[in-house]
Amino acid sequence: METPIKGRFTKTQLMNIHRFLFEDIYPFAGLIRREQISKGDTMFYPPHLIGQELDKVFAKLHTERMLHETDRKRQIEHLSYIMSELNIIHPFREGNGRSIRELIRCMAIHYGFTLDWSRVDRDTMLNAAVRSVVDDRAFCDVIMACIVEGQRCTEISLNKK
């Protein structure tokens, strides 16, 4: 078991997760991208806006007290919102999906439940990612499908695969 990436759900924590996951693969691990990128018809945020947009997303997470939510349905909606926003920002050149999923998994643990992303297939995840550009609740069904019922997690661990 690796040492967990601790944080308060901030841009820095997301960058640290990315660095941890990809430091042995990419020289740009943990660094915000400086290139304009797209996938298919989806154009992600331009590099000069990434930092401020990430700050806005994480500020909203904290100012609206999303981390204090106790209603499971609202928790899932918050997770979907954060996941959708981070997806369209796409802060890294590569590895956005894995880094974002790990941050969302950590947030779920904060809420008191566990997510197992292997419960949904790649196509389901990609379809939700495409829809999330126009619907910040696009990941709700994916997150629901990934909840491990009856397992309450109190420790965050991050293992490289």
Give each language-model segment a name.
Residues M1-K161:
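FIC/Doc superfamily catalytic core
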